């Protein structure tokens, strides 16, 4: 696979995972997800990961 294909696959996988978690939260809490905020956690060598904040109503 080339880099573009790998990137596209990773984006689709992440999107699918987030969708599953939104559905799971709605079922367990009965509330809607209003927003998801991603804050990058970086090191001197680049992006390490993200902190995630989910808001429900």
UniProtKB/Swiss-Prot annotation:
Taxonomic superkingdom: Bacteria
One GO CC term, this protein: cytosol
Gene Ontology BP annotations: unsaturated fatty acid biosynthetic process
Xref: InterPro entries: Gns (IPR012563)
Function: Overexpression increases levels of unsaturated fatty acids and suppresses both the temperature-sensitive fabA6 mutation and cold-sensitive secG null mutation.
Family to which the UniProt record says this protein belongs: Belongs to the gns family.
Protein name stated in the entry: Protein GnsB
Origin species: Escherichia coli (strain K12)
Higher taxonomy: Bacteria, Pseudomonadati, Pseudomonadota, Gammaproteobacteria, Enterobacterales
